[in-house]
Amino acid sequence: MACCGGGRGEGAAATESEAYLEGEAVREARELVAELCRHFYGQGWVTGTVGSITVKANDPALPLADQLIVMSPSGVQKERMVAEDMYVLSADGKVLSSPVSKPWPNKPPKCTDCAPLFMKAYLMRGAGAVIHSHGMETCIATMLDHGAKEFRMTHMEMIKGIKGHGYRDELVVPIIENTPYEYELTDSLAEAIAAYPKATAVLVRNHGIYVWGDSWINAKTQAECYHYLFDAAIKLYQLGIDWTTPEHGPINSAKRPRSVLSSSIPNGCPDSKSSKHCVVLDIEGTTTPISFVTDVMFPYARDNVRKHLTSTYSSDETKEDIKLLRIQVEEDLKNGIVGSVPIPPDDADKEEVINALVANVESMIKADRKITSLKQLQGHIWRTGFESKELQGVVFDDVPEALKHWHASGMKVYIYSSGSREAQRLLFGNTAYGDLRQYLCGFFDTTTGNKRETRSYFEISQSLGVDSPAQILFITDVFQEAVAAKSAGFEVIISIRPGNAPLPENHGFRTIKSFSEI
C-alpha cells in the first residue's frame, strides 16, 4: 500500500526495521503531531477536519532524508486527535503503519490527501516538517491582489521569523491556483518550489498555505509568522495602507503626473485603461553602466569564489548554493556545455568539491550565463563585498532623481534583472546616493523567467496586479528583451547608455539617453 507512490531504495529497509517503527522516535513524533493538531485547531488553522501536519521521526543515527515520516489522517476531528490516529510512512512515501478503524460515526481511516504535496517538500527541500493550514488569513491574502502570482511584503518585523529574511527584505510567497482535489495541486506546488528556491511556503488561492522547515519548531515558527503577516496585510488593506512598499503609504492615493507614465482624460481623472501604474527597470545598461558589472562585479565574484566557498562551506546557505550548482552542472554535462566539469559527491574531499565548483563557476562567469544557480552564488559573494565596503553600487546620475520623482508621484517602481534579487538589493542599497531601495517596490530575477521570453513579462504583469499589461512601462537596453516585453503588452523604452550594444536599424522603439527624458 502506497500513500503517494515512489520507488524504494536499498537503504529503506534499515529505516523500516521493527525497532525503529515501534521505537521512541516514532512514538514521540506521533504524540507531537496529535498535540500540534489540537493546538492549530485552537488557532483556526485546521477546523472542520481540514488541514494537516507531518513531521520526520527524528533519529540522530539516521540522515534526515532516511528518517520515517508521521502524517495526520484525513477526515478526523483535529481537536480530538491522538497518537494512535497517525500514519507512519517510509522516507519515499510508502505506508508502513495505519491506524485501526474506530466505531461509527467515525469514518474509516485514510492517509491525508496532502501526502503527495508533503512528499514534494520533503524530497525537494529536505524538510523536517510540513504544515498545511486553512487559516482564514491565508485565503484572504491571496484575494487582496486579484490575479497576482505572488504575495509580497516588506519592512515588517515578523518577516525576520522567515528563514533567510530580515526586516528590510522583501518577502515573496508564490501563489498557485486551487483545484477541486488536493492531489491535483501536486505538480503546481512542485513547480513553485523549484521556481522559488528561497521560499519556505506556497499559498493556494482561496484555499490555504503549505509551510515547511528544517524541524517542527522551525516550521511552526514560520507558520505563525506567515499567518501574522497575512493578517497584518489584510488589516493594512482595510486601512488603505500599502503593505508592499517600505514606507507603507496610502494605496494608489497619490496624484499621477502628466507624462509618458500617465495619460489623462478631459475631466482630469486618469484613464484606467491607458495610465501607467508601474515602471519596471533593467539594471545593466539602464540604471547602471555595463562596465560596472563587467569590470567590477563579475571580477569580484570570480576572484573571491574560492575564498567564499571555503569559509562558508558548511553553512546551510552555501549547501543550498552547491545543490543548485550540482543540478545545473549535471544538465550542462548532458548538453555538452563547454567548460563544465563533474562535481564530486558531498562526501568527497572538501578541496576536490571546491576545485570543481570553482572551475564551473569561472566558466559560467566567462560565458556571462544568466542562470539562477550562478546568480544566487554571485549575490552571496557580493554581499560580503558590500558589507566590507569593498564594493559600492553604481547608478547613472539621473537615476536617483527619477526614482524620487516617480516615488513622490505614487508610481510603483520594480527591478527586473538577471542578477539575483539579493544582488539587486545590495546594489541599490549601497550607492553613493545612499540607500535607493526606499523608492523601489520589488525585485524580479530569473526565477520569474528568462528575460528574452514573453512569458516572463506576462508573469510580472500578473504579479503586479494591473488591469492591463499596457499599464506597465519597461525600460531596458536589450532589443530582444524589448521585443519580448512588447509582445506581452508592455509599453517599452530602450535605454541608450555609453557601452551599450548597438540596436538594429528600424527597431521601432522609443529611445532615451537619460531618465530625465521620460
UniProtKB/Swiss-Prot annotation:
Keywords linked to the UniProt accession: Amino-acid biosynthesis, Hydrolase, Lyase, Magnesium, Metal-binding, Methionine biosynthesis, Multifunctional enzyme, Zinc
EC number: 4.2.1.109, 3.1.3.77
GO biological process, one term: L-methionine salvage from methylthioadenosine
Region annotation Enolase-phosphatase E1: where it falls in the sequence: 279-518
UniProt entry tagged with the keyword Zinc: yes
Entry annotation: catalytic residues: 157
Annotated TM spans: none
InterPro entries: Aldolase_II/adducin_N (IPR001303), Aldolase_II/adducin_N_sf (IPR036409), Enolase-ppase_E1 (IPR023943), HAD-like_sf (IPR036412), HAD-SF_hydro_IA (IPR006439), HAD_sf (IPR023214), MethylthioRu-1-P_deHdtase_MtnB (IPR017714), MtnB_viridiplantae (IPR027505)
GO CC aspect terms: cytoplasm
Reaction(s) catalysed by this chain's protein: 5-(methylsulfanyl)-D-ribulose 1-phosphate = 5-methylsulfanyl-2,3-dioxopentyl phosphate + H2O; 5-methylsulfanyl-2,3-dioxopentyl phosphate + H2O = 1,2-dihydroxy-5-(methylsulfanyl)pent-1-en-3-one + phosphate
Cofactor note: Binds 1 zinc ion per subunit. Binds 1 Mg(2+) ion per subunit.
Region of interest called Methylthioribulose-1-phosphate dehydratase, as start-end residue ranges on this chain: 1-242
Residues reported to bind Mg(2+): 282, 284, 477
Presence of the UniProt keyword Oxidoreductase in the record: no
Xref: Pfam families: Aldolase_II, Hydrolase
GO terms of molecular function: acireductone synthase activity; magnesium ion binding; methylthioribulose 1-phosphate dehydratase activity; zinc ion binding
Family: In the N-terminal section; belongs to the aldolase class II family. MtnB subfamily.
Protein name (database record): Probable bifunctional methylthioribulose-1-phosphate dehydratase/enolase-phosphatase E1
Natural source organism: Oryza sativa subsp. indica
